């Protein structure tokens, strides 16, 4: 593989001195017993690369990157890809205690993260909608835009920064297939307007913004569902960059996640395979 460019950010560290750095990551090929982790990376702080390679474990956990001497409050933190094969990094933790026990269970980790990032324990109320669409690929875009044009108040939730899914500027899979075929001759009208999102991303975003009853939420990943009996009452989404959570209420939900995530979270029957 060809390593990708470094990913960097600035963080504020309150005290000078020695800090120990952990990353929550794993070897994503370990379920298939691949001996050498394909997604390895290192962390650099203020340009100094820490000792240990990361992305080696067989499950999501905190791996020790190394220690660093901090001299200023503002510091650069950089992920340095070593392989070009999709390394995973969920979070980076700076601690004065090398032997600290860091939460890793789902519930404990969520509470720990919210505490450190000052995120409220309860999600923000995102309001009630006539229709909530989860996923903004071509299917989600079509459902949301058409719903808004029919007069519905629509929330379109996308877990990527850009619309289009596989047809977006991130992936660029060409849109193809039959449209406007009997007996559903109107099926495909919105897709004909959109065409290939990757070639007209700004225009697609403008289409979304033009619909006055359509609210668009990029970078929000739906991870939880609440139900009354068998009926979905709300979905909760987390911002993939800052961790903020918003709960969206509706009586109608469309799963356009591409992987059936919403249906799975709601307890729907499913199968795994290829067609």
Sequence positions of predicted segments:
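Core beta-strand elements of the Rossmann-like FAD/NAD(P) dinucleotide-binding domain
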Residues: 127-129, 243-252
């Amino acid at each position: 593989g060809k390593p990708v460019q470094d990913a960097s950010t600035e963080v504020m560290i309150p005290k000078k001195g020695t800090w120990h750095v952990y990353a929550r990551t794993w070897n994503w090929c370990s379920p298939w017993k691949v001996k050498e982790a394909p997604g390895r990376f290192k962390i650099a702080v203020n340009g100094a690369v820490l000792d240990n390679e990361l992305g080696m474990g067989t499950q999501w956990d905190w791996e020790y990157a190394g220690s660093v001497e901090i001299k200023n409050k503002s510091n650069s933190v950089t992920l340095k890809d070593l392989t070009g094969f999709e390394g995973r990094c969920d979070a980076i933790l700076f601690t004065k205690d090398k032997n600290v026990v860091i939460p890793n269970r789902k519930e404990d980790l969520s509470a720990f993260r919210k505490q450190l990032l000052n995120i409220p324990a309860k999600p923000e109320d995102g309001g009630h909608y006539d229709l909530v669409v989860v996923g903004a690929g071509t299917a989600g875009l079509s459902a949301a835009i058409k719903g808004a044009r029919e007069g519905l108040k629509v929330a379109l939730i996308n877990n990527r920064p850009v619309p289009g899914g596989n047809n977006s500027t991130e992936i660029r899979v060409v849109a193809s297939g039959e449209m406007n075929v009997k007996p559903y001759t109107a099926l495909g009208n919105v897709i004909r307007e959109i065409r290939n999102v990757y070639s007209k991303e700004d225009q697609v975003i403008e289409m979304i913004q033009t619909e006055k009853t359509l609210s668009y939420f990029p970078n929000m990943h739906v991870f939880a569902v609440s139900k009354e009996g068998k009926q979905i009452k709300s979905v909760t989404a987390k911002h993939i960059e800052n961790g903020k959570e918003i709960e969206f209420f509706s009586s109608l939900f469309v799963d356009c996640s591409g992987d059936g995530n919403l249906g799975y979270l709601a307890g729907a029957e499913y199968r795994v395979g290829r067609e």
